Regions:
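Contiguous, amphipathic alpha-helical segments that mediate oligomerization or scaffolding
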Residues: 4, 14-49, 201-220
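Extended cationic-aromatic binding surfaces that line active-site or macromolecule-binding grooves
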Residues: 34-89
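Aromatic/basic-lined ligand-recognition segments
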Residues: 65, 158-171
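Charge-rich, low-complexity terminal tails
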Residues: 168-224
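Aromatic- and glycine-enriched beta-alpha-beta binding-site module
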Residues: 70-130
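A generic structural signal for short, non-catalytic loop/turn and secondary-structure boundary residues
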Residues: 55-58, 77-79, 94, 150, ...
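Short His/Asp/Glu-rich catalytic/ion-coordination signatures at enzyme active sites or charged loops
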Residues: 1-30, 181-195
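Compact, glycine/acidic-enriched structural inserts
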Residues: 105-164
């Protein structure tokens, strides 16, 4: 199924226009339905170790394939990936740390954490990470975690944020504007019969990382 998704997206990348998409709409609808089924299976299996996402519906986690081109110089109408975000306080629009799957030709990945937090949440996350830095680093330094998710991703400030010492040992962590880690995968990873078993194990490694971040997010959202 995932091989068919990648093939469809490869063709879409070469024919990113409404005429081609409409001619292949039934094919897209069938693949999207299959992807929804896969994401629901992931949710149900992740919920066995992260019960906070139990009851989440896959359809609420999938991102639209249609691009917002209103303010973009790139006027191609469609995204060239299938993706879903599974988090405890909702689906794709959630501010909570969660689990992300992304299928794209030569750009597949699994990811987790908090991406693009609003300023107030970013400030709160930095504060809690700074005050509990040893615990945070210990999570990321565990061998299995570090092997799967080598570094944090996203934009990094050139200088330390205001209010923090410039000689802080883990300055790069605090300079991040996102607290997200990524495991890049070859397309073939998702073609294997046991890909979901492996993905669930990779997501399981994220649980302590997400749990740490969600302590802050829950306070920010007034969920505690």
């Amino acid at each position: 199924m995932n091989a068919e998704i990648i093939q469809f997206l490869t063709e879409l990348r070469q024919n990113n226009n409404r005429e081609w998409f409409q001619a292949n709409k039934s094919r897209y609808d069938s693949l999207r339905k299959g992807f929804i089924d896969e994401v629901q299976q992931l949710i149900d299996r992740i919920a066995l170790f992260d019960p906070e996402i139990a009851g989440l519906e896959a359809k609420d986690c999938l991102f639209r394939i249609y691009r917002d081109i209103r303010f973009s110089p790139d006027k191609t109408p469609y995204k060239i990936h299938f993706a879903a975000y599974m988090a405890s306080c909702g689906g794709r629009g959630s501010e909570c740390a969660g689990y992300y799957i992304h299928l794209e030709p030569d750009g597949c990945l699994l990811s987790g954490g908090v991406w693009c937090p609003p300023p107030a949440l970013l400030k709160a996350l930095r504060k809690d990470i700074y005050e509990n830095i040893e615990d945070f680093v210990a999570i990321m330094e565990k061998p299995a975690f570090k092997k799967t998710y080598p570094t944090m991703e996203g934009e990094v400030l050139k200088r330390m944020p205001t209010g923090y010492p410039s000689d802080f040992k883990y300055d790069e962590i605090l300079r991040h504007k996102d607290f997200s880690v990524v495991s890049y995968k070859p397309d073939e990873f998702f073609f294997e019969p046991d890909w979901m078993d492996k993905a669930v194990e990779d997501f399981k490694l994220l649980y302590p990382f997400n749990q740490f971040l969600n302590y802050t997010v829950d306070e920010y959202l007034g969920r505690v």
